[in-house]
Amino acid sequence: MAKFDAHLKCSFCGKSQDQVRKLIAGPGVYICDECIDLCTEILDEELVDSQGNPRHSSESNRKSATASHKSGKPAPTLATIPKPQQIKSFLDKQVVGQEAAKKVLSVAVYNHYKRLAWQGDGQGETDLSATRLHKSNILLIGPTGCGKTLLAQTLAELLDVPFAVADATTLTEAGYVGEDVENILLRLLQKADMDVEHAQRGIIYVDEIDKIARKSENPSITRDVSGEGVQQALLKMLEGTVANVPPQGGRKHPYQDCIQIDTSQILFICGGAFIGLEDVVQKRLGRNAIGFMPSDGRGRSRANRDLQASQVLHHLEADDLVRYGLIPEFIGRIPVSAVLEPLDSQALESILTEPRDALVKQFSTLLSMDNVQLEFESDAVEAIAQEAHRRKTGARALRGIIEELMLDLMYDLPSKKNVKKFTVTRTMVDEHTGGKVLPLPANDERSHQESA
């Protein structure tokens, strides 16, 4: 063996093992440290010629990737952070209803960015006796289409911070097919134009968080790579850690350059419908009704059973989320929770007309580009809201109904030069939602109606 080792030589320059400092073996080939240095220089020269950005080594790549983007936007200060009442007033302009949830969000977001401003002043870093402030992530619970994502988007718009939406259903535990949890941070980084400092003050909304609930209360039954495994992977990110994010996304591997992001200043808002959670709470509230009880006890239990789902969720406790499938460590990192109410017909009517980006205003703006004034009768708005409420998909149903209703209108009106105004009536809505597509009146009839 010693004789064999003495004859080892570099497959590229021919130098023996004794003539070089290090000889690295591959499958049937060898390369010395001098040839490796030469290859590195050649690659660096090519990068300089093609990009005009010299990069000397993989270690310098990591440093430059982390520090190449300095934030051009100033960090928040106590003077610039909007107060909770100001935050709620801004939310009121965009989101209809959900008063309790907006109040919870306003206070939580204000405290979070006040904490960042306090750390930015250096008080929390230089004074060892100062109280350290920890962040409080937020959990939004509510049915589909009730405004969970819109609330988070509106907050990001007000605070002028990067905002990214992630789908928890695509995440899997490391080593399995699917997305790594670090890809969530990559989306935020892309929204911040790859500005690391700016991204570290952003907001991430993790949607469908209820879909990663553990499939069974027994944690040892089977490997749950898209449920409990994802919760475990998210723990450190929610709490605050320095994560290595691949700039191009995808799976991480040991030899790629990564961007380091500190998640301790990122606000995570998790949202989900949590279908069936009210049954878990109801079971706990009505547990005392089993067996022989006084009449007043049975009455209280019967009243609990009669509570609506939204009312039941106001009695939500952490143990209920554990029974639903979230692990205690995960719940502990999302201490602030808010329950959103399902939208009734009256709220859906308001959504159609009141917010800045209301659907009626959007379609009126679209037709105004064709010099046509579009109006909706109040009865028509009411009928659209009632149909959306019947479909039980919340505010998302509104756009679908109006798109279907306006299809023929949007097709014909741009070609009609002498039509300047069109009114959507309840009759049109009723006939459309009843399964009949109402044909548009002839051009001369509409003109006659308009002149009349």
From Swiss-Prot:
Function per UniProt: ATP-dependent specificity component of the Clp protease. It directs the protease to specific substrates. Can perform chaperone functions in the absence of ClpP.
Gene Ontology MF terms: ATP binding; ATP hydrolysis activity; ATP-dependent protein folding chaperone; protein dimerization activity; unfolded protein binding; zinc ion binding
Alphabetized PROSITE patterns for the sequence: CLPX_ZB
Protein name, entry field: ATP-dependent Clp protease ATP-binding subunit ClpX
TM stretches of this protein: none
Residues binding ATP, per UniProt: 143-150
PANTHER family, sorted: ATP-DEPENDENT CLP PROTEASE ATP-BINDING SUBUNIT CLPX-LIKE, MITOCHONDRIAL, ATP-DEPENDENT CLP PROTEASE ATP-BINDING SUBUNIT CLPX-LIKE, MITOCHONDRIAL-RELATED
Domain ClpX-type ZB: 1-51
